[in-house]
Amino acid sequence: MKLSPLMALAGLASAQLALALPQATPSASATPSPTPGDGSFASTNGLQFVIDGETGYFAGSNSYWIGFLTNNADVDLVFTHMKEAGLRILRVWGFNDVNEKPADGTVWFQMHADGQSTINTGADGLQRLDYVVQSAEKHGIKLIVNFVNYWDDYGGMNAYVQAYGGSDNTDFYASKDMQAAYRAYIKAVVSRYLDSPAIFAWELANEPRCQGCAPSVLHDWIDSTSQYIKSLDSKHMTCIGDEGFGLDIGSDGSYPYGYSEGGNFTMSLALPTIDFGTFHLYPSSWGTNNDWGNGWVASHGAACKAAGKPCLFEEYGVTSDHCAVEKPWQMTALNTTGIAADLYWQYGDQLSSGQSPNDGNTIYYGTDEFTCLVTDHIASIGSRATRK
């Protein structure tokens, strides 16, 4: 998901406000008694996922902002509510790139400047992500952690381009210097959580594109990067984080099925170092209609079935009529062979600093929309499992 400039500022403001609030200590935040998982690593079994020994279809959500919170109690609250609701997977942004160090205590993970990169392992850096992983372990929630953003939100590939030289984000994929810095960051993050059962999968990027590039550019980067991640960690799964562009199966000739953004869904899914497929759905941004989304979901399910790997319906959202629009997509995903889980964009909750960021797609815990798209959806998942 690409955030609007207003949303990016709102996220920063939320983090800054949280800094001014009393901070929960690790001992205080450990007072609840959540039930963790069984300590096993998530995996695939044919066209399905396996979480804590359970094979089936799973529901989850996205939270780009949770790793930037500075109040531990807020992090615990999110995972407590997710656990209560039956959400099993949360996709979080494992990047927060800047070109100059913030002066106000804002959380940042990596700084790129003058051809060099500095990883922040301090209290306003990766220690915030540490707590997210720690709390997820306690609550039995699995995390998808990605390493860079295609978009400029929280730095993205453009932060590398600004520091190392280049014209646009497409230069990121072939630059030796940028890739060296990117891989150093991957190694720093992966090494911190190598033995954590909370990690569902490592993800190369949020919505990587290479507009106007030959398909080989993005594919070769996916191939080499996923091999590198597997060389560091063979226990956790690896995925791309792409939108699912570039697909012939079920194609109606519309923009998302085409290859203009440099992606080839089928070709990259076939890589042995990619454990499952990912795809997103935003009809309003792609020039399609909401009903079109059901065919998009079915097409990716068919592609994953043909590849013998599960598909994760990783992001989907609209800014109005959430239940009426998104419920059919959920049901299509649940009933399509090859689709193994879905994560709506995005999770919302009431934090100590106020409501979590709302980009219009947000579904807040405890609301009627949450009942429709989470509570009822998870009941449908349970009902299907019982029928089987």
Curated annotation (Swiss-Prot):
Enzyme nomenclature, EC number: 3.2.1.78
Signal sequence region: 1-20
Annotated active site: 207, 315
Gene Ontology molecular function: mannan endo-1,4-beta-mannosidase activity
Positions glycosylated per UniProt: 264, 335
Alphabetized UniProt keyword annotations: Carbohydrate metabolism, Glycoprotein, Glycosidase, Hydrolase, Secreted, Signal
Primary location recorded for the protein, binned into one broad class: secreted
Biological process annotations from GO: mannan catabolic process
Pfam family, one: Cellulase
Binding site for substrate: 93, 206, 282, 345
Known catalytic reactions: Random hydrolysis of (1->4)-beta-D-mannosidic linkages in mannans, galactomannans and glucomannans
Domain of life: Eukaryota
Localization of this protein: Secreted
GO CC annotation: extracellular region
Coiled coil: none
Recorded family membership: Belongs to the glycosyl hydrolase 5 (cellulase A) family.
Protein's job: Endo-1,4-mannanase, a crucial enzyme for depolymerization of seed galactomannans and wood galactoglucomannans.
Protein name: Probable mannan endo-1,4-beta-mannosidase A-1
